[in-house]
């Protein structure tokens, strides 16, 4: 039985943890402003430190990161001897680059209070003040951050060989790259702990194969921790990641009735606003202006990357100069994502991050005051994660989800059943058709100035419709209920896109616009020149009726049916090829078959040998400070 804390000591005091935390950890918590543990930390840290596998489900913003970082650090610093060179003691896996970076930064901040680790992480330069030196036998924690897009796998391996880190913080794809090297070791004698942060997303089918390949390279005798805001929805998959009799920790929030009925922080107020489609974007200015004091950090969530690209050009015109709008989505280049993320984090003026669900999970964006879900998420699980960007660590926050009148209002009851209740937005906001018309005119003025923006709008609208049609709550979000003309005008479109979903639409597809499309130009001179050339070529050659009919026939097929047709063709092609190979094999003599098998075996062995030699050459070259030629590795783009 664990000893009880001294009389008068709060169970959530850092010095009440059993087994006791190191003095330098207590000093770090005090210096970082954490006066006492959060409920999830008070529950999870003692269990994880006591060699238990843990499954931790707690509301977003509840301090889960320190719940696993402190046990990992304490475990590695209490070993009998240092971990061997090029051996790994702990791994922390995150679904996104941004979240992995934040975990690494928190870990580095913590280790700054442990002199041996701090010296290993940031060795002194010639012009720096001399740092104390520690013998090689001194226990220390040396982390390495692995991110696709910022470094190549060869550079990661070179850093690993040079610094010999014992803790890896990584996204799944880049981690698997490193663990595939024969120079990286995770034997049972060295490896201690595995942490899966945002575990339900890591256990999603999209990451299943990568995760399984990683787990095959790790010893089964280890401590494993799963941390997330909604672990319960992935519990049936926990066995697959090798937990042994895990202890489940669930930390919920009491609602007004005093019953544990909420899955979000008590400091977060979740609301909804019902607005007609034509007023949707015009309402955004009213929302951010009505919140007092003015929110310094706001996040707007939309459903698609194309939507971010288009609305990042339109919304600043509607919001005015009072807010800095910054786009962020998963298809941005890694350096662009990091740059925009840092701009938002470091902005001293009111800023709005326009993003997709790439920013909905795990990111600890400090001081977010307001979250607006312009598009309700296709996956209801994402709703809680989006809202949870505000109201973190006890800070007051507000979230608003925009709904169309009618059937979409049933989403309120749907959320109530899922224990994420929302209340009407207050103060109430009134709209007029004149406000909506003015917003449409402002957006269209920008679109008319550049045909490229029109193209982006058409693409974004189609992309939004596809996402809308995939809502898991399909009985609430129905394409057949959409008001096409109102939506098109709200988006600032000059016409509705050609979509099979509009095949039976009898309204005004031009949205009341009359435009000379032949003379509607791109701002980019090269692009406009090319458009005119194509227009001239089409006029001179003339499109044949059969070609025109064929194109129209293709357009009349829904995008989902087109994708299904392509998949069927590919499957038939593969089946045909397989039959041909089988027939050729059956015609061979036994001697011929044996020769083929021997040849294939030799080719495979040679391929593996060459690949290993290339990996080794690159690693050695990088370790020596040289740049290996032909080292153009594909960058891992992360998860969206």
Curated annotation (Swiss-Prot):
- Give residue numbers for sequence motif DEAD box: 197-200
- Which coarse location class describes where this protein primarily resides? nucleus
Coiled-coil positions: 521-629
List residues of the Helicase ATP-binding domain: 45-249
InterPro entries per record: CTT_SPB4, DEAD/DEAH_box_helicase_dom, Helicase_ATP-bd, Helicase_C-like, P-loop_NTPase, RNA-helicase_DEAD-box_CS, RNA_helicase_DEAD_Q_motif, SPB4-like_CTE
Q: Name one GO molecular function term.
A: RNA binding
A GO cellular-component term linked to this record:
nucleolus
Keywords of this entry: ATP-binding, Coiled coil, Helicase, Hydrolase, Nucleotide-binding, Nucleus, Ribosome biogenesis, RNA-binding, rRNA processing
Q: Spell out the Gene3D superfamilies in the cross-references.
A: P-loop containing nucleotide triphosphate hydrolases (3.40.50.300)
Reactions catalysed, semicolon-separated, are: ATP + H2O = ADP + phosphate + H(+)
Which PROSITE patterns is this protein grouped with? DEAD_ATP_HELICASE, HELICASE_ATP_BIND_1, HELICASE_CTER, Q_MOTIF
> Motif Q motif residues?
14-42
Instruction: Check the record and name the Pfam families matching this protein.
Output: CTE_SPB4, CTT_SPB4, DEAD, Helicase_C
Key word Nucleotide-binding present: yes
**Locate the Helicase C-terminal domain: which residues?**
283-437
UniProt record, GO biological process: rRNA processing
The answer to whether the entry has keyword Iron is no
The UniProt regions of compositional bias labelled Basic and acidic residues, in chain numbering, are 577-593
Q: Which residues bind ATP?
A: 58-65
What does the UniProt entry state concerning the protein's domains? The Q motif is unique to and characteristic of the DEAD box family of RNA helicases and controls ATP binding and hydrolysis.
Q: PANTHER family recorded for this chain?
A: RNA HELICASE
**What protein family is recorded?**
Belongs to the DEAD box helicase family. DDX55/SPB4 subfamily.
Q: How is this protein named in the record?
A: ATP-dependent rRNA helicase spb4
Q: Which organism encodes this protein?
A: Aspergillus fumigatus (strain ATCC MYA-4609 / CBS 101355 / FGSC A1100 / Af293)
- Lineage of origin: Eukaryota, Fungi, Dikarya, Ascomycota, Pezizomycotina
């Amino acid at each position: 039985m664990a000893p009880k804390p001294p009389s008068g000591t709060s169970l959530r005091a850092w010095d009440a943890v059993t087994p006791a935390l190191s003095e330098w950890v207590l000093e770090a918590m005090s210096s970082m402003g954490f006066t006492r543990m959060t409920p999830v930390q008070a529950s999870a840290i003692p269990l994880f430190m006591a060699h238990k596998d843990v499954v931790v489900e707690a509301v977003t913003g509840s301090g889960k990161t320190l719940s696993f970082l402190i046990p990992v650090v304490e475990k590695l610093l209490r070993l009998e001897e240092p971990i061997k060179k090029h051996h790994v003691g702990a791994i922390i896996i995150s679904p996104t680059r941004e979240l992995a970076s934040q975990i690494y930064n928190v870990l580095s901040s913590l280790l700054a209070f442990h002199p041996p680790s701090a010296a290993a992480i940031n060795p002194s330069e010639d012009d720096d003040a001399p740092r104390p030196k520690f013998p090689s036998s001194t226990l220390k924690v040396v982390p390495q951050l692995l991110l696709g897009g910022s470094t190549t796998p060869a550079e990661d391996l070179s850093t690993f060989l040079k610094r010999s880190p014992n803790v890896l913080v990584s996204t799944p794809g880049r981690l698997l790259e490193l663990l595939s090297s024969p120079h990286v070791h995770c034997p049972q004698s060295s490896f201690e702990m595995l942490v899966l942060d945002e575990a339900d997303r890591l256990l999603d089918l999209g990451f299943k194969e990568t995760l399984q390949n990683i787990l095959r390279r790790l010893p089964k005798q280890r401590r494993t921790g799963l941390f997330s805001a909604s672990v319960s929805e992935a519990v049936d998959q926990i066995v697959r990641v090798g937990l042994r009799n895990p202890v489940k920790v669930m930390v919920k929030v009491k609602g007004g009735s005093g019953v544990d009925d909420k899955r979000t922080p008590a400091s977060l107020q979740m609301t909804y606003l019902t607005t007609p489609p034509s007023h949707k974007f015009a309402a955004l200015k009213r929302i951010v202006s009505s919140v007092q004091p003015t929110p310094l950090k706001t996040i707007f969530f939309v459903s698609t990357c194309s939507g971010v690209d288009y609305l990042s050009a339109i919304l600043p015109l509607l919001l005015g100069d009072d807010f800095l709008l910054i786009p962020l989505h998963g298809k941005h280049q890694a350096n662009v994502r990091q740059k925009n993320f840092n701009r938002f984090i470091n902005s001293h003026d009111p800023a709005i991050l326009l993003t997709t669900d790439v920013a909905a999970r795990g990111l600890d964006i400090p001081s977010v005051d307001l979250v607006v879900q312009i598009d309700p998420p296709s996956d209801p699980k994402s709703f809680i994660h989006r809202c949870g960007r505000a109201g973190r660590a006890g800070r007051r926050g507000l979230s608003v989800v925009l709904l169309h009148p009618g059937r979409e209002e049933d989403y309120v009851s749907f959320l109530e059943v899922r224990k994420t209740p929302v209340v009407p937005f207050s103060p109430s906001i009134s709209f007029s058709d004149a406000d909506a018309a003015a917003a449409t005119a402002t957006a269209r003025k920008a679109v008319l100035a550049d045909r490229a923006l029109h193209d982006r709008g058409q693409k974004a609208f189609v992309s939004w419709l596809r996402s809308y049609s995939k809502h898991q709550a399909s009985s609430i979000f129905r394409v057949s209920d959409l008001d096409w003309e109102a939506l098109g005008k709200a988006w600032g479109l000059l016409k509705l896109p050609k979509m099979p979903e509009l095949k039976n639409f009898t309204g005004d597809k031009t949205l009341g616009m009359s435009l000379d499309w032949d003379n509607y130009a791109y701002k980019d001179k090269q692009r406009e020149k090319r458009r005119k050339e194509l227009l001239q070529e089409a006029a001179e050659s003339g499109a044949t009726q059969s070609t025109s009919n064929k194109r129209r026939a293709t357009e009349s097929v829904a995008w989902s049916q087109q994708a299904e047709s392509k998949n069927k063709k590919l499957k038939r092609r593969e089946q045909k090829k397989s039959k041909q190979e089988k027939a050729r094999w059956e015609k061979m003599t036994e001697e011929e078959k044996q020769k083929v098998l021997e040849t294939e075996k030799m080719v495979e062995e040679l391929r593996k040998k060459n690949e290993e030699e290339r990996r080794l050459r690159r690693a050695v070259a990088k370790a020596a400070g040289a740049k290996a030629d032909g080292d153009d590795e594909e960058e891992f783009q992360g998860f969206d």
